[in-house]
């Protein structure tokens, strides 16, 4: 239903919930403190390589209509998908948008991409726009699927050509049914070369539109707070800030610049297993 304020009509806000004993590491054995300090002194300055021939694939799963499951239509999601397509095309990604996907379709598309040769690509990006559940599932247009079933396809032991490269997932979906009422605040304004083994769960980043247990807001005309803020911050800062800094700006924008007519708030949640800084430019 449209809402109005001071005579101006708005598309209204909606949510994306589904209705309603240790061994000393070998690297430290026979290693003195100075050696450790030498190895780690400049670790925080290391960046992921982006000078590959291609930036990589960007898959956008845009689920709007849920006819078989009786969940609400996600009006405004097409605005998000279009903005994401524009943003990541501008960054040099090969973008694929898939609309109204069943859970089996989502798994199939991601499995196919995980089996591709990514040797000439710097990263992989996936954005999922859908309803979500409190247990961490996202919804196909038919049934839910846990996000881990999707991201596990890109683990280092399964997708060899993306080992050591960023695998970035943006999730626009509710993670529960709680509503955030907010609170007022008082405020003023060189290591030697060696072969390394990488944990299979390394180099993933998950950027969720909201924290566990809470709803995620989407304007029915303008798109979701999270995706619109993400695209805006990438446009403003993607040419000089690294990804975590950009996502911090996204958190700031969503937390402070948005509010529903009923004074409800939202804060995105970033879970990072990245091991270096990632920039969207070469």
From Swiss-Prot:
Coiled coil: none
TM spans (from-to): none
EC assignment: 3.4.22.56
SUPFAM superfamilies documented for this protein: Caspase-like
Keywords, sorted A to Z: Apoptosis, Cytoplasm, Hydrolase, Protease, Thiol protease, Zymogen
SMART domains: CASc (SM00115)
Catalytic function, reaction form: Strict requirement for an Asp residue at positions P1 and P4. It has a preferred cleavage sequence of Asp-Xaa-Xaa-Asp-|- with a hydrophobic amino-acid residue at P2 and a hydrophilic amino-acid residue at P3, although Val or Ala are also accepted at this position
Gene3D superfamilies the UniProt entry points to: 3.40.50.1460
Xref: Pfam families: Peptidase_C14 (PF00656)
Active-site residues per Swiss-Prot or TrEMBL entry: 131, 174
Cell location: Cytoplasm
UniProt main location, coarse: cytoplasm
Gene Ontology CC annotations of this record: cytoplasm; death-inducing signaling complex
Chain's role: Important mediator of apoptosis. At the onset of apoptosis, it proteolytically cleaves poly(ADP-ribose) polymerase PARP1 at a '216-Asp-|-Gly-217' bond.
Family in the record: Belongs to the peptidase C14A family.
UniProt xrefs under PANTHER family: CASPASE, CASPASE-3
Oligomeric and partner information: Heterotetramer that consists of two anti-parallel arranged heterodimers, each one formed by a 17 kDa (p17) and a 12 kDa (p12) subunit.
UniProt protein name: Caspase-3
Record gene name: casp3
């Amino acid at each position: 239903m449209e809402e109005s304020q001071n005579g101006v009509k708005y598309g209204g806000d909606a949510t994306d919930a589904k209705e309603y004993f240790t061994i000393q590491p070998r690297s430290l054995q026979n290693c003195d403190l100075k050696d450790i300090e030498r190895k780690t002194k400049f670790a925080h300055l290391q960046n992921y390589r982006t000078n590959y021939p291609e930036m990589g694939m960007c898959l956008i799963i845009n689920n709007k209509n849920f006819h078989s499951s009786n969940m609400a239509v996600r009006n405004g999601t097409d605005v998000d998908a279009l903005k994401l397509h524009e943003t990541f095309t501008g960054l040099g990604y090969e973008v694929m948008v898939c609309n109204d996907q069943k859970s089996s379709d989502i798994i199939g598309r991601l499995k196919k991409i995980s089996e591709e040769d990514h040797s000439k690509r710097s990263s992989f990006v996936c954005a999922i726009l859908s309803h979500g559940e409190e247990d961490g599932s996202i919804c196909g247009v038919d049934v839910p699927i846990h996000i881990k079933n999707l991201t596990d396809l890109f683990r280092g032991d399964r997708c060899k050509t993306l080992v050591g490269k960023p695998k970035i997932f943006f999730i626009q979906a509710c993670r529960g049914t709680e509503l955030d009422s907010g609170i007022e605040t008082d405020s003023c304004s060189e290591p030697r070369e060696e072969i390394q083994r990488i944990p299979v769960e390394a180099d993933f980043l998950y950027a969720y539109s909201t924290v566990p247990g809470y709803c995620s807001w989407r304007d029915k005309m303008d798109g979701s707070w999270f995706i619109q803020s993400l695209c805006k911050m990438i446009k403003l800062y993607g040419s000089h800030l690294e990804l975590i800094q950009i996502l911090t700006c996204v958190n700031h924008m969503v937390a402070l610049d948005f509010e529903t007519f009923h004074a409800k708030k939202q804060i995105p949640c970033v879970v990072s297993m990245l091991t270096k800084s990632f920039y969207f430019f070469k």
